[in-house]
Amino acid sequence: MVPATETVLVVDDEQGILEALADLLREEGYRVLTASHGREALERMAEVKPDLVLTDWMMPVLDGPALIERILQDPSLRDIPVLGMSAVDVNGLKRLHPAMEFLQKPFDIRALMKLVRRSLDANPRARRG
């Protein structure tokens, strides 16, 4: 278990995936915020700055790429690490966005948790507690 001071924002338009990821992260001790599209994620981040964003790539209203662009344009958000999730071939996404980490849906739970932990460990925002 990790301290509940680390907050992960999970963004996915598929309710079942959103709830499953939120439950899994809570079981691991993370504080979890959820959003069903990018615009809702930005609204959540206006209230609480997460230590990590885990976002689906293809969503209605505001998709993953547009969400990431908005995060990078905002000085108060740009240092938050973002992990992308997609049902499409993530190798192509990795070539387009080499600085980002991506998970292929369906993903291995252990691989997901290792990537979340590694991203949080590398983030000074999360380490400040």
Locate the predicted segments by residue.
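Acidic, metal-coordinating helix/loop segments flanking the phosphotransfer/catalytic sites
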Residues: 34-52
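Receiver (REC) domain active-site loop signature in two-component systems and cognate sites
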Residues: 59
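Charged docking surfaces used in two-component/phosphorelay signaling
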Residues: 19-27
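Hydrophobic/aromatic residues positioned on beta-strands within the core alpha/beta folds
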Residues: 83-85
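Active-site residues of response regulator receiver
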Residues: 12, 56
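A Lys-centered signature of the CheY-like receiver
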Residues: 105
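Non-catalytic signal-transmission and effector/linker regions of two-component phosphorelay proteins
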Residues: 1-7, 108-129
